[in-house]
Amino acid sequence: MEIIPAIDMQGGRCVRLYQGDFQRVTVYDDDPVAVAHRWVAQGAPRLHLVDLDGARSGHPVHTDIIRAIVQSVDAPVQLGGGLRSIAAVERALELGVQRVILGTAAVHDPELIRQLVQQFGDAIAIAVDARNDMAATAGWTETAAISAIDLVERMAALGVRRVIYTDIARDGTLSEPNIATTRALVRPGGPAIIASGGISTIDHLRRLAEVGVEGAIVGRALYTGDLSLSDALAAVQ
């Protein structure tokens, strides 16, 4: 199971939101590039970048920072936030991003997802962000009329091979991940699942590994020091 540090960007800084609320933001560093270097130096096998301003505006905003990270770290990067067109996905991949993550488009434009999967295959991942088990879109500001489980099934039918599942109510809270829903999403022959939201202890990581997820994205716990990256990596070796 991969341990993937999250770098969420807002206004050019590295931040964390509480339950996806843009009014409840904590700034952890003014230099996301330096943060990326720090996590990779500590052994991160991959970085999870989120362009929060992009998620709200519908188009990528932190392109220069993303480019600087991709070009200077020795680890693959996955990127989400504001990627809602073929052109936006192509630009992200041209920057050197290994994997692009789409969320809003998965709900509102499944035909786009089908086209992207056909064209880019494994480079496409889907973010299934859930509030009260229903999918959320537009930077988590809107709730759609489809459940997280149904959305994953719909994406699997389109050929999607990887899903990042986040329980918004737990994100940034240091509480615990939603093990029950995560377990329901991990199915033989289904998309690989990467878990996110509320992961803050070694026990959380071990429970997720037992469920069978491909990876775990860790954010606030790494920044507060509640969880060290070296301990997390060692726990799942």
Curated annotation (Swiss-Prot):
The reaction(s) this protein catalyses: 1-(5-phospho-beta-D-ribosyl)-5-[(5-phospho-beta-D-ribosylamino)methylideneamino]imidazole-4-carboxamide = 5-[(5-phospho-1-deoxy-D-ribulos-1-ylimino)methylamino]-1-(5-phospho-beta-D-ribosyl)imidazole-4-carboxamide
One Gene Ontology CC term in the entry: cytoplasm
Record keywords, A-Z: Amino-acid biosynthesis, Cytoplasm, Histidine biosynthesis, Isomerase
Positions of disulphide bridges: none
Locations listed in the record: Cytoplasm
Pathway annotation: Amino-acid biosynthesis; L-histidine biosynthesis; L-histidine from 5-phospho-alpha-D-ribose 1-diphosphate: step 4/9
Pfam families, A to Z: His_biosynth
GO terms (BP aspect): L-histidine biosynthetic process; L-tryptophan biosynthetic process
Molecular function as annotated in GO: 1-(5-phosphoribosyl)-5-[(5-phosphoribosylamino)methylideneamino]imidazole-4-carboxamide isomerase activity
Family designation: Belongs to the HisA/HisF family.
HAMAP family named in the record: HisA
The protein's name in its UniProt record: 1-(5-phosphoribosyl)-5-[(5-phosphoribosylamino)methylideneamino] imidazole-4-carboxamide isomerase
